[in-house]
Amino acid sequence: MSCKKQRSRKHSVNEKCNMKIEHYFSPVSKEQQNNCSTSLMRMESRGDPRATTNTQAQRFHSPKKNPEDQTMPQNRTIYVTLKVNHRRNQDMKLKLTHSENSSLYMALNTLQAVRKEIETHQGQEMLVRGTEGIKEYINLGMPLSCFPEGGQVVITFSQSKSKQKEDNHIFGRQDKASTECVKFYIHAIGIGKCKRRIVKCGKLHKKGRKLCVYAFKGETIKDALCKDGRFLSFLENDDWKLIENNDTILESTQPVDELEGRYFQVEVEKRMVPSAAASQNPESEKRNTCVLREQIVAQYPSLKRESEKIIENFKKKMKVKNGETLFELHRTTFGKVTKNSSSIKVVKLLVRLSDSVGYLFWDSATTGYATCFVFKGLFILTCRHVIDSIVGDGIEPSKWATIIGQCVRVTFGYEELKDKETNYFFVEPWFEIHNEELDYAVLKLKENGQQVPMELYNGITPVPLSGLIHIIGHPYGEKKQIDACAVIPQGQRAKKCQERVQSKKAESPEYVHMYTQRSFQKIVHNPDVITYDTEFFFGASGSPVFDSKGSLVAMHAAGFAYTYQNETRSIIEFGSTMESILLDIKQRHKPWYEEVFVNQQDVEMMSDEDL
């Protein structure tokens, strides 16, 4: 379609409509409300990098009309419920009949009640979630032809925290090769080390939330997600894939034709920055080096600021201009802080101990994963907050054990992707030993004829005051890994937190403003936890923590994490000590403790002498 024709299809703006949403959707005029077959408005080029929105749809369905096909489009009926806080429209179910060729947003705007709510919630984002016939959070650009007859949706409004550009537009769908619509679902939280967040809307970035993505047959998976408009822009350039049921991989280049009704997670692969191609002309390469460096630094303001600080620091401290002083300064500034090497004996011991570390996963109201380990006999230990994620919100505690027994599985052999969910154990419908304050929970494996790995408990070993520790777990739901990290002594916790908060504020103030010194008071003086630096974040909760000799000393629980440039970073991480967990079990669950630990001597955990 020519630009001239595109402009001829634009309609006047209804100034009474929500101005924020108008940036993405053209309001429906009274003439359009009475004409179900009205063509769609405002078509923009797909290649326009400005054409992005926060959570609203970016694609309208506007099929091309052939001269021989002049029949009137059929209507489609859906039911709309307004979930708003005032009585006027609260929980009203509205019947909506409109042309199936129109988008959901255009159809909704024919309802006076919806238009009033848009006007009432100016500056907020409208979210539409399917409840019957179609599920999850729906793209407002989806054509009604994709909806089943009689489908039901619920409308809510979310306060927008992002600042949208004034020139944002919506996309037309003139380039589709097929009129057959395919709907599939994407979990709002991605998996993988590099980028956990994949959606723009903060309200959608929660566990259990899923987005209904629509596409047309012949399009690729990457086309569908990038054109959807609700996902972050890195999906256009980075390498990623879809994971189905934790055992099937679909690359983003695959067609969407067979994806109808299926659920996926987005796994983002670590993006490697390609090295610059070698210059054909060495002299030209030399001439361009300085210019290239300046261009790179200009793209990263924080890098430029930090480099200027380092240079200024060198100028202040370098009083003696000799090579020895310069070497000492470099060694002090950039040298390693903590030795993280281990003897071969300890490494071999850790490999043996890793056999008892399990990948715990579930599929209930939500899906998720965590880490656990064999504690004693058939009993495994994990974090209490993991149980909260498994059972979901609003469930009676009396039903927790049943839910756990139905949906939780554990495998100890997940060291390669093919072994992710093989040879697993179910757990008993039993949930009695736990503590929310210390964040631990004991579950019991259900015997199935497989050999249970050796128990890791072999007495109480005090946590090290400093030095090196090892964490074994499944961060981000990935294959089993070991992380060697440094203990932050209790006396240095407050100072370390303060230093890191200040440094993060200087680097990226908008990302760490939610943390203050008060945020860390709960762990700064808490003797029941051990603090350390680690790159184990989501999915590693419940990982055993070993000292430098291979003795079990704690269980990794949580940390103060934040997201910067789509990457997860941390101020400080911590875990509950085994000494505190055992003492709490002995005091609060004495009968169980005596039954399970009777006649067990408090001997040291396996050490390198056992090899």
Swiss-Prot record:
Main localization category: nucleus
One GO CC term on file: chromatin
Active site: 385, 439, 541
BP term (GO), one: DNA replication
Subcellular location as annotated: Nucleus; Chromosome; Cytoplasm
Effect of residue 334 to R/G: Abolished autocatalytic cleavage
Entry text on domains: The PIP-box mediates the interaction with PCNA.
Substitution effect: residue 541 to A: Abolished protease activity
GO MF annotations in UniProt: peptidase activity; single-stranded DNA binding
Effect of residue 231 to A: Strongly decreased single-stranded DNA-binding
EC number(s) reported in the record: 3.4.21.-
Source organism of the structure: Homo sapiens (Human)
Site (Cleavage): 334-335
Quaternary structure annotation from Swiss-Prot or TrEMBL: Interacts (via PIP-box) with PCNA; then interaction is direct.
Alphabetical keyword list: Autocatalytic cleavage, Chromosome, Cytoplasm, Disease variant, DNA damage, DNA repair, DNA replication, DNA-binding, Dwarfism, Host-virus interaction, Hydrolase, Isopeptide bond, Nucleus, Phosphoprotein, Protease, Ubl conjugation
Sequence segments annotated as region (Disordered): 44-73
Motif PIP-box location, chain numbering: 16-28
Induction of its expression: Regulated in a cell cycle dependent manner with the lowest expression during G0 or the quiescent phase and with peak expression during G2/M phase (at protein level). Upon virus infection via the cGAS-STING signaling pathway.
Recorded superkingdom: Eukaryota
Region listing for Interaction with SV40 large T antigen, in residue ranges: 336-611
Protein name: Serine protease FAM111A
Noted disease: Kenny-Caffey syndrome 2: A disorder characterized by impaired skeletal development with small and dense bones, short stature, and primary hypoparathyroidism with hypocalcemia. Clinical features include cortical thickening and medullary stenosis of the tubular bones, delayed closure of fontanels, defective dentition, small eyes with hypermetropia, and frontal bossing with a triangular face. Gracile bone dysplasia: A perinatally lethal condition characterized by narrowing of the medullary cavity of the long bones and of the skull, gracile bones with thin diaphyses, premature closure of basal cranial sutures, and microphthalmia. Most affected individuals who survive beyond the perinatal period develop hypocalcemia with low parathyroid hormone levels.
Gene3D superfamilies: Trypsin-like serine proteases (2.40.10.10)
Record PTM: Autocatalytically cleaved; activating the protein. Autocatalytic cleavage takes place in trans.
Modification Phosphoserine, positions: 26
Pfam family, one: Trypsin_2
